[in-house]
Amino acid sequence: MTQVHSDVSIMPQVIISAQQLTQKIKLPQKELTIFSDLSLSILAGEQVAITGRSGSGKSTLLGILATLDQASGGELIVCGESISKLNEEQRAQVRLKHIGFVFQSFQLLPHLTAVENVMLPLRLHPSFNFAEAEQRALSLLQKVGLERQATQTPKVLSGGEQQRVAIARALIAEPKIIFADEPTGNLDSQTAREIEQLLFQLNRELGTTLILVTHDHTLAEQCQRHFELLDGQLIEHPRTGG
């Protein structure tokens, strides 16, 4: 019997495809273009950094890629779903299925314990089961090194510990993409480095795509890809790291 060998390689999945994205805002006297005709493709499992000067529009771009906001023009596909013509309710369903968020300000509910904060995204799912959600949340807290702080509220946690809770919360619904907007901006330098390494470690372990918006070029250069938003254009820097 003759064996037939396929020469077709398994190509990495394009998880985000943006074509000619444009964002404009209307001011009282004029229309301001934040950026125009931006295109990029991001593969599943990649670590991607977006940098830029303050006011360059990098957080605006993240909001569009993460389906939080709608672009003025262009085409966006996230996890195989065309976003550009969806309304807010439909975009929210895309986020619920595919996306987790880590913010600079942690955004934990102060009256809930760490484990309760981590469980929050699962409460939005129709199949929510408390016991299963709690077990998954406890497992994630262990993964981020906070199993002993599970029953503590945010006010007794350090900034780094609160961000670890936020990272666990971002992962609880098993998203395909994590968007992190200045995730270490409120932390001291040592804690910031620890959180950065945790994000990279979880990216490698779980295969989740990581998209960072940061002003820190040292952090950006640790990512597999580094884009800079400059004068309304997106420039990809050649990778220099290992």
What are these model-predicted stretches?
Residues 226-238:
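H-loop (His-switch) and adjacent beta-strand-loop-beta switch element
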Residues 15-16, 21-222, 226-229:
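ABC family nucleotide-binding domain
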Residues 1-24, 236-242:
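ABC-family P-loop ATPase nucleotide-binding domain
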